[in-house]
Amino acid sequence: MSDNLSLHGTTILCLKKNEEIIIAADGQVSHGNTVLKSTARKLRTIANNKIIAGFAGSTADGLALFEKLAVKIEQHKHNLLRSAVELAKDWRSDKYLRRLEAMMIVADRSHILILTGNGDVVEPENNVAAIGSGGLFALSAARALMSYENNLTAEEIALKSMNIAADLCVFSNHNIIMEKVV
């Protein structure tokens, strides 16, 4: 394996239930099989918490993409979908951006989007999205809880799902940060 294990070493989960949208992230930063930090903040807000982004992959690359997305959001008057598509166009055509190794989940009141390193913009089904090495664990847990636990809030589902992912993924931890889209 390459030194680039940090590309997959995290868990980011976003879900919508009953008009409540939550994005959650673990706090672990790994390089190979070494934990470099356990309290990293992988979520960022834009437009007074109306848009929230979480990133997986290289921290520097994730922050660079977040900055570019923030500029697009301002240019397009907080239209998340248009901003994401414009960022994806840049990501595909710019030689520098094409080398960035990161993925993002971005959400506002209307959309949950996954932005991939290939310049794709994906709006997932079932109001749940997850990325990173623990993403499939968190996604599976969230979908199951949303289907069978009607009494849980979006925040409770996110926390339970992230804890399951942290139990199973060695590149994720239980230091979970959550943000709510307002």
UniProtKB/Swiss-Prot annotation:
It holds the Pfam family Proteasome. One of its GO terms (molecular function) is threonine-type endopeptidase activity. GO terms for biological process: proteolysis involved in protein catabolic process. Keywords: Allosteric enzyme, Cytoplasm, Hydrolase, Metal-binding, Protease, Sodium, Stress response, Threonine protease. It is found in: Cytoplasm. Allosterically activated by HslU binding. Na(+) binds at A166, C169, S172. Its EC number is 3.4.25.2. The active site is at T10. Disulfide bonds: none annotated. It catalyses: ATP-dependent cleavage of peptide bonds with broad specificity. GO terms for cellular component: HslUV protease complex; proteasome core complex. InterPro entries: ATP-dep_Prtase_HsIV_su (IPR022281), Ntn_hydrolases_N (IPR029055), Proteasome_sua/b (IPR001353), Proteasome_suB-type (IPR023333). Its main location: cytoplasm. A double ring-shaped homohexamer of HslV is capped on each side by a ring-shaped HslU homohexamer. The assembly of the HslU/HslV complex is dependent on binding of ATP. Protease subunit of a proteasome-like degradation complex believed to be a general protein degrading machinery. Belongs to the peptidase T1B family. HslV subfamily. This is ATP-dependent protease subunit HslV. It comes from Rickettsia africae (strain ESF-5). The gene is hslV.
